[in-house]
């Protein structure tokens, strides 16, 4: 490691603490309270407290430290992570049928994320504001309004970007974790016997003593590891080593000390169960703690919102969601984006959730099903990558998968008990997103196949036009083409109706590669098909936004001079009608028509001046 890298490592690690660990770092606000609040029939006896603490600690070790940080983070696509990246990697060296199954798993995982992301800001901010019940009990009726006000401000500032505010995230979250550690250590010193719960035998004893009820209680224990997926999803922003370093040096010790500190407090004062986190603090520190808890939960919510924007952009670029307006809020960092439609839809959903559930304890009952479902899918996809891409021994990979599923499946099954008490919410939202993504992908494929059924050869058509040219007019025409060797619809209709052709014709295809970024050297490929026809293929990664002006600049460097304001862009605009279908496919077709009508039009997607665009309409039956 170079000197420069050594100097920058602390800064990157600090930044990772500020962004990556917001969700899991605010879990102590509510996790142990939900475990021991009486909903499972446990009292605050020593065996129950020690059992829950042991389960929480060893889940943090096994799921976060071993599974995600050690194993899953090995699977990266040019340094990027996330469930859709894992899906893409897993399907690279498999059969078509297996790839289809893996794609479905990846889309379900992505859909689950959309389901949980509605709950995360609500439960995080509400659990912090609920500290008012301790500071000033008479203000408890203000918890819901204040939570909505805080989140309204957060969603309103999204369009301005978080570059300036983001600089404060890291020091605030570092302070938060140090406070977690300090509060916990203070309580542990007063009752050090709680450290016996570090022994995993207490977790085993917990299951043996409480049997079926202990299994159901896993639905509350899982709250301690929500946010684990963010470590993998944010890998591209900070790198593997800083994320791992932050976990083992700051986050894990702080979480452990705080959970065990809460346990020590409950053994000494069972009445503290109403809010063991805030009651760890002395009276004089309650208001400052409430303020920094609110800030920490806002930061956790911001990380989740940014994650939704990133996942949506990736899904759009990979063709699983319809094109939508994406605004870059930073000239320096391509990952800082704002998607207005997603932002306000998420805001409305979060407000409805807060008003409907009214208390973080009620939200906790809805939290966990989608998280644990994603954990199961991550285990299957990551071990598939280990076998197919890394060529690990199949028996060793099977052993790893069994070990992961022995933890993931019980956690997921235990959370199914929450289905009627609120777990239906993330599952319903996830199901809607899965239907939307699969509908757009499959119907889009059906449309393109229908449009390319004419079967005419591009080479033959160009040869015919060069041999018997129509009237040629001065200038350059660019025809946007979705496929490389297919005649663009706009070209056929221009010749059919206008019977003219420009002196120079460029067939432009914008392609999304299976990588986050494409190097500028490989950005543009130019091929001259005839004296007056050129084919240009511009490649972009799924973290990049295509820009025709940049493509023209690259073409100029390669010897094909193009000027935006002297070029006419011909595009086809499809007017879709539904053909005869079974009722269920007709419903899917109607959903696709709705998505198509509201999709961002091509000129806006590719930043083409509207006065240079000519759209030729055509009716297509699907």
Curated annotation (Swiss-Prot):
Cellular location(s): Cell inner membrane
Annotated catalysed reactions: K(+)(in) + H(+)(in) = K(+)(out) + H(+)(out)
Annotated Gene Ontology cellular component terms? plasma membrane
Sorted alphabetically, the keyword list is: Cell inner membrane, Cell membrane, Ion transport, Membrane, Potassium, Potassium transport, Symport, Transmembrane, Transmembrane helix, Transport
Residues spanning the membrane: 9-29, 49-69, 103-123, 137-157, 165-185, 213-233, 247-267, 276-296, 337-357, 363-383, 396-416, 419-439
Q: Which InterPro entries match?
A: K+_transporter, K_trans_C, K_trans_N, Kup
Lineage, top-rank taxon, reads Bacteria
Regarding the membrane, this protein is recorded as: Multi-pass membrane protein
Care to name a GO molecular-function term for this sequence? potassium ion transmembrane transporter activity
Give the UniProt family note. Belongs to the HAK/KUP transporter (TC 2.A.72) family.
Q: HAMAP family annotated for this entry?
A: Kup
Its function, per the record, reads: Responsible for the low-affinity transport of potassium into the cell. Likely operates as a K(+):H(+) symporter.
Q: What is this protein called?
A: Low affinity potassium transport system protein Kup
Q: Where is the organism placed in the taxonomic lineage, from the top?
A: Bacteria, Pseudomonadati, Pseudomonadota, Gammaproteobacteria, Enterobacterales
